[in-house]
């Protein structure tokens, strides 16, 4: 379980409107694993891979982006099998069933005051994942790589665009949620001390959502990369802790108004405690969000000095 609390504020280029667009949200994940035979493990994951909650305050008639916003919700169910080829090498693969729904509003002077709104009904579709891992348990070495396929969706829509006389017009839209690649690494570097690192690339530029009435893309996102580097330390048989740095490189400073940040640098501090058959983990993350400009045919708002504070809690029970 995690709660994410972004502070995303900016100033519009018209009337110096002050925007506060970041809204807090939560994410919940459930995981179950079971060794069903010697060398074969089955896993089940229920999570929320994507989410967004953005709303621009201000009068749409007197501000660049007042009334623009987006709400995105998703759910995913993954069934994953892992097979140990030998003591060092394993392979894993699985299927993912994913649902996505959203509502997007485009308004303000930047959009010509068109007061556009689209509801994208829930769409469910399937994708897959595949990967492999190499490990040497004696030195706590493990390297794993996983590729996640894109997922193709087709959803019913309802659009409203008053300047064209369009009111609750039904339609459909086709889009994909992006493919991604994960690389994870860990190794022991001293007694009771672990070095961790990871890399993730998500191909968000593949996301094109073009509703019929609007006739243009709702969002224009850049591909994202994330690097992490951390150190974990076991203080006793029951207690361990970790510190992890995270980094996302900056891209084009002009970004979609529905995601007005550009890269980040963050730090996470976590602890893990064993109580009988249960393991309780918790942590906090602080991230400095990169400066960005909301782009609608040019810069419409400057976002600087923003951050995000997140808290997480995880409970593992063996039986």
Question: For the regions a protein language model found, what residue spans apply to each?
Answer:
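Transmembrane beta-strand segments of Gram-negative outer membrane beta-barrel proteins
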Residues: 1-5
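Outer-membrane beta-barrel porins/channels
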Residues: 8-15, 24-29, 35-319
């Amino acid at each position: 379980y995690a709660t994410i609390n972004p502070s995303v504020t900016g100033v519009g280029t018209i009337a110096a409107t002050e925007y506060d667009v970041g809204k807090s949200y939560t994410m919940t994940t459930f995981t179950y694993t079971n060794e069903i035979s010697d060398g074969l493990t089955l896993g089940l994951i229920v999570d929320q891979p994507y989410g967004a909650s953005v709303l621009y305050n201000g009068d749409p008639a007197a501000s660049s982006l007042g009334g623009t916003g987006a709400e995105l919700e998703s759910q995913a169910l993954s069934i994953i099998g892992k097979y140990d080829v030998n003591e060092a090498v394993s392979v894993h693969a699985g299927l993912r069933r994913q649902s996505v729904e959203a509502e997007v509003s485009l308004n303000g002077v930047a959009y010509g005051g068109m007061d556009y709104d689209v509801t994208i009904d829930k769409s469910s579709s399937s994708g897959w994942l595949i990967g492999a891992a190499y490990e040497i348990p004696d030195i706590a070495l493990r390297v794993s790589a996983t590729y996640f396929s894109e997922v193709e969706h087709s959803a019913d829509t309802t659009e409203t665009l008053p300047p064209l006389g369009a009111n609750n017009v039904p339609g459909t839209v086709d889009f994909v949620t992006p493919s991604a690649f994960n690389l994870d690494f860990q190794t022991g570097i001293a007694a009771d001390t672990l070095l961790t690192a990871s890399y993730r690339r998500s191909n968000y530029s593949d996301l094109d959502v073009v509703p019929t009435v609007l006739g243009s893309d709702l969002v224009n996102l850049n591909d994202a990369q994330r690097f992490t580097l951390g150190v974990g330390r076991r203080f006793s048989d029951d207690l361990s802790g970790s510190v992890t740095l995270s980094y996302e490189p900056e891209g084009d400073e002009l970004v979609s108004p529905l995601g007005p940040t550009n890269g980040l640098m963050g730090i996470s501090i976590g602890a893990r405690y064993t109580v009988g058959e249960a393991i309780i983990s918790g942590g906090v993350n602080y991230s400095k969000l990169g400066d960005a400009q909301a782009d609608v045919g040019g810069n419409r708002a400057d976002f600087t000095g923003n951050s995000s504070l997140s808290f997480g809690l995880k409970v593992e029970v063996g039986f």
